[in-house]
């Protein structure tokens, strides 16, 4: 029995070292292009789970009062950059609640919302759209960025614009002939002066930018819906094969899932590189919003953010930030980033059915672009 416990002890040390090594590698996934490092995006994708398992390992070694506790702790703290993107003080304040109450539209405050509305549930009555409009009205949002906007034949553009009439300025780009894009839209209380649709090769996803005049100053707003992961669809295929108890078909389905994920990692990387270039070329203070379909550990997040943008959650957020309602609320894939000229006052993600972020900041004035709010 003593030999068994000794073997278990050494295996535990080995597993802790392997786990820590993989987790430390995850700290570099944000700088590793999917083209050059095929497996790094997968490590970055699994980083939330890896960190939790390392935390459990640290607790285990602490209880056993062994020096090996430093192995998982080193792995955890090597990923402080990621942790800082999902945790902000005060930690116990829920990230789903605002800390700054905005009771009325205020000239000195700008609140921006990004919301993946999933086609408003494809309802013919427009109930979801009207409900979202009421929610945004209650939160005093100034600018709305929608992904997967979706227009129904029975509740068309005119009906949508009527439901969202509190935001009289809008940009709803149409898909070019022969293409079917996952539609984006921007609605604003402030005048939209210029706009442009960004189309990506071999993708149904897209981005847009528009120049908005706020209190006499221009800001450039990017609304993004980067390459969809298609995890849910491929996961259903894998589950179907597993239910049929056919190991070969299940293996093929798993490989197909991995190949599909990697291809989408590559597409998002190309899209992120383009957004980074466009942000660098912006002549105005910039807000970058939307559904990146990527974690803060990813190449996509680090590339879009670059050295010119700040994360609204890091400048104005609190608690534990997640935006994906599945996978036990572990994942943050939606963002609002901003130029240093803007300063976040609040950043929160309401606990609604679909991903929504709000960012609140002081609005840019004629000679003052120092701060800017966000709701997430």
Identify the function of each model-found stretch.
Residues 117, 149, 226, 291-292:
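Active-site metal-binding loops of divalent metal-dependent hydrolases
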Residues 76-107, 123-125, 133-137, 143-239, ...:
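Structured beta-strand-rich core segments of catalytic domains in phosphoester-bond hydrolases
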Residues 359-368:
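Conserved small/polar residues in nucleotide/adenosyl-binding loops
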Residues 370-376:
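Hydrophobic alpha-helical segments, chiefly the membrane-spanning helices
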Residues 36-45, 169-186, 258-287, 292-354:
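Active site of divalent-metal-dependent phosphoester/diester hydrolases
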Residues 114-129, 151, 230-264:
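Acidic/histidine-rich helix-loop elements
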Residues 53-55, 60-93:
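Transmembrane alpha-helices and immediately adjacent membrane-cytoplasm interface residues
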Residues 12-64:
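Membrane-embedded alpha-helical segments of integral membrane proteins
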């Amino acid at each position: 029995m003593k030999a068994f416990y000794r073997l278990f002890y050494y295996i535990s040390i080995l597993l802790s070292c392997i786990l820590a090594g993989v987790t430390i590698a995850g700290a570099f996934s944000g700088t590793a292009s999917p083209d050059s490092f095929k497996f790094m995006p997968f490590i970055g994708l699994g980083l939330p789970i890896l960190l939790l398992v390392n935390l459990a390992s640290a607790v285990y070694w602490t209880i056993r009062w062994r020096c090996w506790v430093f192995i998982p702790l080193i792995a955890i703290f090597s990923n402080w950059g990621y942790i800082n993107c999902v945790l902000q003080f005060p930690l116990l304040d829920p990230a789903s609640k605002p800390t700054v109450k905005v009771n009325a539209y205020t000239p000195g405050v700008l609140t921006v919302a990004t919301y993946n509305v999933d086609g408003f549930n494809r309802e013919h009555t427009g109930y979801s759209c009207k409900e979202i409009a009421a929610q945004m009205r209650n939160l005093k949002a100034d600018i709305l960025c929608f992904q997967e906007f979706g227009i129904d034949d029975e509740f068309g553009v005119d009906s949508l614009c009527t439901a969202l009439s509190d935001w009289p300025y809008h940009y709803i780009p149409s898909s070019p002939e022969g293409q079917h894009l996952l539609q984006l839209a921007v609605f604003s209380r402030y005048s939209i002066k210029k706009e442009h649709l960004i189309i990506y090769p071999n993708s149904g996803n897209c981005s847009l930018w528009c120049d908005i005049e706020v209190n006499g100053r221009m800001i450039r707003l990017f609304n993004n819906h980067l390459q969809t992961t298609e995890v849910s669809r491929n996961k259903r295929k894998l589950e179907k094969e597993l239910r049929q108890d056919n190991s070969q078909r299940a293996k093929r389905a798993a490989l197909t899932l991995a190949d599909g994920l990697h291809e989408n990692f590559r597409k998002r990387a190309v899209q992120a590189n383009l957004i980074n270039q466009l942000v660098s070329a912006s002549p105005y203070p910039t807000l970058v919003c939307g559904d990146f379909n990527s974690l803060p550990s990813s190449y996509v997040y680090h590339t879009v953010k670059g050295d010119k943008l700040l994360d609204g959650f890091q400048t104005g957020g609190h608690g534990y930030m997640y935006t994906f309602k599945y996978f036990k609320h572990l994942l943050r894939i939606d963002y609002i980033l901003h130029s240093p000229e803007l300063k976040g006052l609040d950043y929160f993600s309401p606990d609604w059915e679909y991903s929504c972020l709000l960012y609140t900041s002081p609005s840019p004035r004629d000679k003052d672009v120092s701060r800017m709010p966000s709701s997430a």
